[in-house]
Structures are given as structure tokens and as C-alpha cells.
Amino acid sequence: MSFPQLGYPQYLSAAGPGAYGGERPGVLAAAAAAAAAASSGRPGTAELGAGAGAAAVTSVLGMYAAAGPYAGAPNYSAFLPYAADLSLFSQMGSQYELKDNPGVHPATFAAHTTPAYYPYGQFQYGDPGRPKNATRESTSTLKAWLNEHRKNPYPTKGEKIMLAIITKMTLTQVSTWFANARRRLKKENKVTWGARSKDQEDGALFGSDTEGDPEKAEDDEEIDLESIDIDQIDERDGDQSNEDEEDKAEAPRARVAPPASARDQSSPLSAAETLKSQDSPLGLVKEVSEPGSTRLLSPGAAAVGLQGAPHSKPKIWSLAETATSPDGAPKASPPPPSSHASAHGPPSGSPLQHPAFLPSHGLYTCHIGKFSNWTNGAFLAQGSLLNMRSFLGVSAPHAAPHGPHLTAPPPPQPPVQVATGVLHGEKASARSSPALPERDLVTRPDSPPQQLKSPFQPVRDNSLAPQEGTPRILAALPSA
């Protein structure tokens, strides 16, 4: 087999069909005919050999079809000069001479010299949208800024933008670099600067100039959060957050405690008595049973007794006020119910209202057996403090001095009688609420408006009207 077009007539297939293993008999026959024609020199056989050679070249080198026109030309199947062959078939030289052939690509190819190495399109490495790696030249600017601001290495937003433009880095890269630089400074300063307090280690290590300006401090904190590198988060952040939660949990307890102490200091009692009531919740109940005691009621309970149920509210601020409140004392010593009616007054274990604590108009509250009616709202709409007749019997022995108290100040003698009656009534327990109508049946006369003379008679008539029906209904029950 020979390629006379390429100037290699000496490259013959001497081995015959063994060179290709009998796979291409047509190609080998055409090559043998071309070689015979070239050796004989006859024109007929030369043309036949040229056609056979063109067929052989086309079949073997089909991708280089440009060799076809030259195969049919006369005398081209003979020996060709080597230089002329290179000038004619220079476009094929790239397969054999990769280094020495400058004319591999014709001028019609407008391809980039290395188009496969730029995945970002037409921009090479100057694409403004592509992040730039931090080099030593770019970080030198950041190091210079850090050395100038070593006391407060927290750049503002504008300074970060300026440094990002100068160093051709992104804002996130600048923030991350400063975060890492601050961590390196902390590690160095722990060794060289000595021990620091925990607050300074957590955030104020460098003595920031923004200690007196809270707005700028918040700005620095926000920027510091933006520049945190997620891969290198300090473990002290979790400890600091736990301490903040503990401080927030202690703050509500500190705010709840002062109101009770402020009210205790403003009370008429002394501070020693207040502390005594806080130490022993049952102390006031024990003092009531003593004959010569004058501290019969705490200021909180006296205020509730004078103002009435509409102005009372639950005491949740202090243990002392909860223990000395009217609804707290009966729970400490609940009075047992009795079968007979007692006209002497409240039991000994209930907090009483001493006459010394009463104002000039001298209104007395009911004993503790009927206090549940006040709290349940049975007499709220009837002016219960002015209508004492429904709570105190008219013909009761201790109710006689109470008539003048509605219009004139009380004389000193009736309060002493009330106190002695209370002290003598220690043995008698409090009456239960079902026994209330029974005493009213015994002591109430048939015509109460004619019995009691007072300028408040119309008010009492209106208030007593619904109450007078209750004994009559209950009186009819035993007869039925």
C-alpha cells in the first residue's frame, strides 16, 4: 500500500494481505494496481492507477476528503517533491506535526484559544460577580486597618464596604476575616495581657469606646453577629446565654418583692410587729385571745373591714398579709358549728376589730360567722356598712349602745362593754349561717320601723324589706 499523493511511494504493502489480516481486500487490490501503474509508466494504466489510488485514499482517509481533487490530477500519482507536499497539504500536518506547524487552524475559525477553561463565560478572572480569594496583598490592607484600630477592632458597615472595595473581596469575606482576626487577638491577649474578667472576655475585651453610647454599642453588636464564622463559633456563647436567662429569671422575683415591703413600711404598725407577723402567721390569732392585748387586727384586715367587700382584692404579694387577712384567719382556726344561738359576738380565734381603730362615726362590722355573706355578695347592693340592724339584734344586750353611733361619736363606755363581752364569749363558738334566721326570729320585733328612730329610716326600710321575708318563710317550714 502506498500513498503517492503524500510523497511516500516507497511505503508499500510488502506483506500483502497479512498486514491487515484479509479484512480490506478492495483497498489492498487498489493499492497494488496503483503501484503497478506507477512502475510501468503507461498512460492508460496510470489513469487507472490514479483512480484506484484516489479510491484507496478516500476509503482510508475519509475525513480528509480534500485529498480527492488532487488524486485525479495527471502525474500526481508519481513521485512528488516533499516540500511541495507540505505546502499543498498543510491542513493535514496537525495530525503529524503538533509543535512545528503554526497554520493548523485557518482564519475562518473564530474559536477561543482555550475555550474549555472558562466556565464563567466571556469573563476570565476579572468577573466582578465572582468572589476573589483572599491573597496576601488583599489581607495586608485589612491587617493595616486592624493595627490602627487595635483597641476596638469592630469596623462599621461603611468601613467594611470600603475595605471590600479596596481589597476586591466580598463583604462576607471581610466580615469573616475580622471575626477570625479578633479570635486570634483574644488568644494572644490571654497570654500576654494577663487575666481578664469574664465580661471582657465575652465581648468587651478590647475596651470599646462605645461604653457610654448604647446606640453605637448595639450597632457594634449587630455587626459582630453578622461577621461570625460558623465553623469557629466559641463555646462561651452558650455559657453567656445561660447566664442571661438566669438574670432574666431573677429579675421578676426582685420586682415582686418591693411592693410588699413598701406597704409594710407605710402601715401604722411598727417594723418589728410586721416581722413578727411574717415569722408566725398564727401570731395575730394568738394575740387576740389574750385578755390585755390591744393588737387585735392587722392594718390590712382593718382596711378590708372599713372599706367593705367591694374594695377588697386578693392578697398575693406577701405572706404576712395573706396570713392576717379576714379570709385567711378562719382557715387557720375554723370555728365549729354550735346548736344554740349566741348573742355575745364572734369567737375568740377570729381577728376582731378593736374600737380604738374605728373612725369617728363608730360603725362596727359583723362577727366572723356572717363574713361569708359579705364575700359572697349577698348584701353588697344594700349599703351593708350603714345597715347594722340586720347584723346586730335589736333587743340584744350589747346592741343597745349602738343606736347613737349612727348620728353621734361613740362614748368611751360602750366599746369597753363590747370588749368584755367578747372576752366572756370565748367559750361560746361562732354560730353557723343556718342559725342566723333563728336569732332574727327571736329578737326582731313585729314593727321595726316604729322601734328604731334614725334619719336613715327610709334607707333601712328599703334594705330590710327583702330581709324580713326570709324569717317568715323559714318560720313556716317547721309548722309544715
Swiss-Prot record:
What does the UniProt keyword field contain? DNA-binding, Homeobox, Nucleus, Phosphoprotein
Free-text tissue specificity from the UniProt record: Expressed in specific and overlapping patterns with Irx1 and Irx2 in the developing and adult metanephric kidney. In the adult metanephros, renal expression is found in the loop of Henle in the S3 proximal tubule segment and in the thick ascending limb (TAL) of the distal tubule.
Chain intervals with Low complexity compositional bias: 254-263, 339-351
Instruction: Tell me any Pfam family this protein matches.
Output: Homeobox_KN
Q: Name one GO cellular component term.
A: nucleoplasm
One annotated GO molecular function? DNA-binding transcription repressor activity, RNA polymerase II-specific
Acidic residues composition bias: which ranges? 210-232
Q: Region (Disordered): which ranges?
A: 190-285, 318-354, 401-480
InterPro entries attached to this UniProt entry: HD, Homeobox_CS, Homeodomain-like_sf, Iroquois_homeo, KN_HD
Q: Indicate where this protein is primarily found.
A: nucleus
The superkingdom of the source organism is: Eukaryota
Q: Which residues bind DNA?
A: 127-189
Residue stretches of biased makeup (Polar residues): 264-280
Location relative to the cell: Nucleus
Has keyword DNA-binding? yes
**UniProt keyword annotation of Magnesium present:** no
The UniProt entry's GO biological process terms, in alphabetical order, are: metanephros development; positive regulation of gene expression; proximal/distal pattern formation involved in metanephric nephron development; specification of loop of Henle identity
Query: Where does the record place the modification Phosphoserine?
Result: 241
Could you say which protein family the record assigns here?
Belongs to the TALE/IRO homeobox family.
This chain belongs to which protein, by name? Iroquois-class homeodomain protein IRX-1
Where is the organism placed in the taxonomic lineage, from the top? Eukaryota, Metazoa, Chordata, Craniata, Vertebrata
**Gene behind the chain:** Irx1
